[in-house]
Structure formats: C-alpha cells, structure tokens
Amino acid sequence: MIALALPAQDSGSFTPPGIDEMHLPAILPWGAHDGFSKQMLLVILSVVIIATFFILAARKQQLVPGKLQFAGEMAYGFVRNGIAKDIIGGKDFIKYVPLLFSLFFFILVNNIYGAIPVIQLPSFSHVGGAYVMAGIVYFTWIIIGIKKNGLKYFKLATVPSGVPWYILPIVVPIEIISNFLVRPVTHSLRLFATMLAGHLIVMLAGSGIEFLVMQENVLLKGASVLVLVGAVAMYMLEALIMALQAYVFTLLTAIYIEGALHADSH
C-alpha cells in the first residue's frame, strides 16, 4: 500500500496519513503543541453532556416515567445492578455506585467521540488520559483496602492464604508485581491500545479509499468499493468496542474494589 502511494505522493495528489493525524491542533493562540487542545475541550464537553443529560432526566420525576427519565433510570440501573451490586455485593456496593457510574459514562462518551463524523478521535486514544483514569482507580482501591483492613491490607493482598511457607518467597514477589505494578499499567493500556488500534484501522481504511479513488486504473477504483464495505464493517465493530471498553474498565474497577474490601477472604 505504501509503495503504491509513493508515486501519487510525489505528484502532490495524495499524502499518506502520518503521525500528525493523531494530534488535534490547539484551539488557543498559545501553546501550539502543549496548549489547550481540542481533545481537552472534548473531555470537558463530555462532562457537560453527561451532567446535562442526567439532570434533565431526573428533573421532573414521575411515577410513570417519560422517555428521558426512563433512559436515565435504565442507565443508572445498568451500572448499579449490573456492575456494582453483582460484583461488590452486600451492603458495601451502594457507596461505590457514584464512582462506577461516573467512570462508565465518562469513558463511554469519550470513546464514542471516535464514531462521530468530523471528530472521529476517541479521547483515550492518547495514553495520558488512560493513565489518569487508571491512576484514579489504583489509588482508590488501595485507600479502600487500607481503610477496611489497615496496613494489614498489604499483607492480605500479597500473601495468599493456604500457600505453604516454603513457596511464599516465590509467590509474594509475583503478587506484589501483579497487584501493585502490572495491574494499573494493564488497566490503562487495555483502554488506550484498543481505542488507538480502532482509530488507526478506520483512518487507514479511509486513506486507502481516497487513494484508490484517485487512481486512473479502473480496477483500483473498483477495489475502493470493497475497501469501503470493509471500512463500514470495521466502523460498526469499533463502535461496539467503544461501549465494551467502557464496560470492561468499570467492571475491572468493581472487581478491584471488591478485592480490597474482602482481601481477608481471598
């Protein structure tokens, strides 16, 4: 594909996508590379969108809910019952519903940006945002574990019960690395890598269609139709993955919180 694109690039008729495609321009006159970018604006806008929707949905509550109230209640119930209650359970789950609810819809909206024409860039396709989200979750479940079990939590989290003492020198370092070093990294990279890969595939498919359409060869022009069909299929799959990743990130957060609350039983 690159070899085919090079002659067209030299003639000035086609430019293959590069790394600049992954960086939205700054929207303020200062800080062209590290200023307030459109991506930052999209993150702020997502908060406004979520807050506005649920405020309007809960503003005039009725016994027989309207469409907006029904949608809001279904969205809340999905996180409350389908994630928090099912995973954390007991009487503890209710206090963590606001956190899980906020995480799910914040990630969902920022992911869905990638499926909206013109924008077409999920906020978490840049690793910084994914690191921040995973960092918040990381310190949250550690604090929860310490609050529930005291400093004994670190022993409970790294020394599995029922393991023979002579195996502990092998198991404990593995548990420390797995729980306190690898876990936050994989939690963030899973979100980032999925969003980045999906965005790259859609972007390359679009560039491939543009390149093929610009060719004089009829067969190449016809091939653009096949690429278009594949691009539409990938676009639909990517939209599904955007929602799925929001669910997976929130589900793992609930699992980590449950583990911190019941570390003594693991």
Swiss-Prot record:
Membrane topology: Multi-pass membrane protein
A GO MF label: proton-transporting ATP synthase activity, rotational mechanism
Functional note: Key component of the proton channel; it plays a direct role in the translocation of protons across the membrane.
Protein name (Swiss-Prot/TrEMBL): ATP synthase subunit a
Key words, A-Z: ATP synthesis, Cell membrane, CF(0), Hydrogen ion transport, Ion transport, Membrane, Transmembrane, Transmembrane helix, Transport
SUPFAM superfamilies, per database record: F1F0 ATP synthase subunit A
NCBIfam families in UniProt: ATP_synt_6_or_A
Subunit structure, as described in the record: F-type ATPases have 2 components, CF(1) - the catalytic core - and CF(0) - the membrane proton channel. CF(1) has five subunits: alpha(3), beta(3), gamma(1), delta(1), epsilon(1). CF(0) has three main subunits: a(1), b(2) and c(9-12). The alpha and beta chains form an alternating ring which encloses part of the gamma chain. CF(1) is attached to CF(0) by a central stalk formed by the gamma and epsilon chains, while a peripheral stalk is formed by the delta and b chains.
